[in-house]
């Protein structure tokens, strides 16, 4: 599955680097320069942790615990989704994997169990929960350096263009307050855009 895909990609990258050096398209120093960058290793470690979280089902268990604790109403379910994203945000460096691979299937399952399906009564709960999930995913993607794959590129650009260095903790300190405000207000804000909410 995903392990084979990662192995194939890694092999392709290494073969590409080797061919680039052999054909003098780049020097060996240029080919290996990225391996000495701490941001690169931070992202590699985060992807390894993410693989473990997804493969072991830990992400799903975290989300279900949040739902168990907060999900007494549909708005509570919205907060459970936000809490799950907040916990998983710094650990899973792909917001697509986090949102689409962990959170979305759980949200879809909860929506269907409440009798809310895409073709049948989506406004009961599914519409609201999917909106919360999608927006919470984007908020947590911006909160942490490892929140999404593009953030390390932004960090590197800030260093190269402006001379400003964003490490993981600096990024988190800058993003935590606006992120928490966004996650706290999101379920209530989106509640007013939903036509009707049921209580469970």
Specify the residue positions occupied by each region the protein language model found.
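Catalytic-loop motifs flanking and including active-site residues across diverse enzymes
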Residues: 8-11, 150
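Hydrophobic core segments of alpha-helical transmembrane domains in multi-pass membrane transport
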Residues: 2-3, 17-23, 45-50, 82-89, ...
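Phosphate-coordinating loops and pocket residues in cytosolic domains that bind phosphorylated ligands
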Residues: 6, 33, 173
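Membrane-water interface of alpha-helical transmembrane segments
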Residues: 7, 68, 72-75, 124-127, ...
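Membrane-embedded alpha-helical segments and adjacent helix-loop junctions characteristic
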Residues: 10-118
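Juxtamembrane and boundary regions of transmembrane helices in multi-pass small-molecule transporters
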Residues: 95-99, 114-198
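Short, small-residue-biased leader/transition segments that mark boundaries at the very start
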Residues: 1-6, 199-200
């Amino acid at each position: 599955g995903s392990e084979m895909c990662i192995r194939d990609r890694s092999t392709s990258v290494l073969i590409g680097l080797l061919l680039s050096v052999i054909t003098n398209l780049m020097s060996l120093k240029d080919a290996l320069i990225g391996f000495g960058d701490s941001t690169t290793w931070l992202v590699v470690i985060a992807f390894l942790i993410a693989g473990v979280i997804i493969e072991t089902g830990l992400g799903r268990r975290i989300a279900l615990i949040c739902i168990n604790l907060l999900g007494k109403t549909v708005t509570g379910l919205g907060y459970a989704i936000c809490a799950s994203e907040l916990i998983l945000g710094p650990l899973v460096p792909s917001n697509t994997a986090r949102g689409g691979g962990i959170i979305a299937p759980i949200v879809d399952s909860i929506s269907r169990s409440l009798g809310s399906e895409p073709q049948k009564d989506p406004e009961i709960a599914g519409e609201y929960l999917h909106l919360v999930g999608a927006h919470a995913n984007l908020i947590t993607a911006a909160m942490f350096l490892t929140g999404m794959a593009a953030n390390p590129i932004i960090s590197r650009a800030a260093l190269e263009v402006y001379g400003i260095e964003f490490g993981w903790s600096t990024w988190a300190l800058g993003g935590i307050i606006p992120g928490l405000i966004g996650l706290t207000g999101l379920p209530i804000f989106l509640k007013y855009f939903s036509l009707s909410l049921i209580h469970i």
